[in-house]
A protein has these predicted regions:
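Conserved helicase NTPase motor core
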Residues: 6-17, 21-25, 56, 64, ...
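ATP-hydrolysis module of ASCE/P-loop NTPase motor domains
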Residues: 18-19, 80-83, 101-193, 217
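A generic structural signal for well-ordered alpha-helical segments enriched in polar/charged residues
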Residues: 43, 74, 123-127, 182, ...
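P-loop NTPase Walker
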Residues: 1-106, 111, 211
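Solvent-exposed alpha-helical segments within well-ordered globular domains of core cellular machineries
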Residues: 53, 66, 70, 74, ...
Length: 239
């Protein structure tokens, strides 16, 4: 295993070897922030014996996560589990696979991609006798995103006895949305908006679950922290 600080400058070494409290690294593009983050991960494992299963390392794309895993394994070896080096959506999926039964969903719930969302919307449009084209699909995805900025809808989906007929509106887009989430529940499907919302709702509703994950995660590191949303920040703060 290589010496973890050989390729680092003094500022990077300071960030890598700091182990207590909040650490904020401010630097421009291409200055080695990600290098410092991956080396800090390796430093915690090698020098302090922290298990990789106790370190959460968040990045924003699967490509970036895979690159970080590659760098970490180059320093530590292939045997180390880097499954907690992931996007926030992937991490939330991991949490929900363990905990979502509390919300009356099966652990093998479906993660809905754009194709799945379109199929569900096509079903809704057929039921309502509406023609769906590319423009209307994009519009409804934007409406779903807007609607799901509020987490209150999760309580409907988490209640197996919820009566969806109580959700009414004169706006066609609202009616489509209500039918969409009803079908989501029928298929036990969560879209990308739901993954974070369900995790926040779960942590808020079941303090013992939040405490479990807070205890498990000794260190949390976030790449490109300046790009996170307010909701993502709320989730990270809870942890």
């Amino acid at each position: 295993m290589q010496n973890l600080t050989d390729s680092l400058n003094p500022s990077q070494i300071e960030a890598v070897t700091a182990t207590e409290g909040y650490i904020r690294v401010i630097a421009g593009a291409g200055t080695g922030k990600t290098r410092a983050l991956t080396h800090r991960y390796a430093w915690l494992v090698n020098e302090y014996g922290i298990s990789p299963s106790n370190i959460l390392c968040i990045t924003f794309t699967n490509k970036a996560a895979n690159e970080m895993k590659k760098r970490i394994k180059a320093m530590l070896g292939e045997a180390f589990d880097t499954s907690f080096v992931a996007t926030l959506h992937a991490f939330c999926t991991r949490v929900l696979r363990e905990e979502i039964s509390r919300l009356f969903y099966p652990e093998n719930f479906i993660v809905l991609d754009n194709v799945d969302q379109k199929k569900i919307l096509e079903e809704v449009y057929d039921e309502m006798g509406i023609r769906m084209d590319t423009a209307s699909f994009r519009f409804m995805i934007d409406q779903i995103r807007y609607y799901k900025n509020l987490i209150t809808y999760v309580s409907y989906l988490a209640d197996p006895d919820f009566d969806y007929d109580t959700l009414t509106s004169d706006k066609p887009s609202d009616e489509i949305m209500f039918r969409y989430i009803k079908k989501q529940r029928k298929y036990f499907g969560l879209d990308f908006f739901d993954l974070i919302n369900f995790t926040i709702y779960l942590f808020r509703t079941f303090p013992e679950v939040l405490e479990k994950w807070q205890t498990r995660l000794c260190y949390i590191m976030v790449d490109e922290f300046q790009d996170i949303t307010a909701k993502e920040f709320k989730l990270i703060r809870r942890l």
